[in-house]
Amino acid sequence: QMWCLSDSRIAYGCDCSRSYKPRNGDVVLPMAWAKVDGYHAENERTIAWGQISGDRAAAYKAVLAAREAEFKILKPGTAFSELYQAAANEFKKGGFGDILPGRVGHGVGNSAHEYPSVAEDNTLLLQPGMVITIEPGLMDASWGGVRHSDTVLITEKGYDRLTQYPNGYLSNR
């Protein structure tokens, strides 16, 4: 499956389709979900359409910092709540403490979204063989949203990223 949300509609998640041509300063979120032999994976990247500014630019920077913070501690024995807190700390540093997401990742397998959630109150520890997403995101109806999502396999010593799309700041220019 592939779909794309843009501008303020990103904040509402899976939205009804419409014809819209992005304008300079918009953010666009293409989402690719795959299913192979009964197992799911997802890969999402926010793309800056032209030059973004204000909350969109600040949120983009905070999401990239949150993503990096999650990946730094991604290994067996790390609690899901620790992953959440690592991302939340970066969101707060970026000035987004008032719109923290409920989760910054989730399990994935026979369904696209499964337990366990990478959430503040989940003390479950990562174990080898788990497949989860790392998907820090910030959403607000007034300016849209920014999210990067990768599917990862937890290994004995760390993780393997199963989705290989480029990371960092992405722009159509």
Regions found by a protein language model. Name each.
Residues Q1-R173:
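Active-site neighborhoods and metal-handling regions in enzymes and metal-associated proteins
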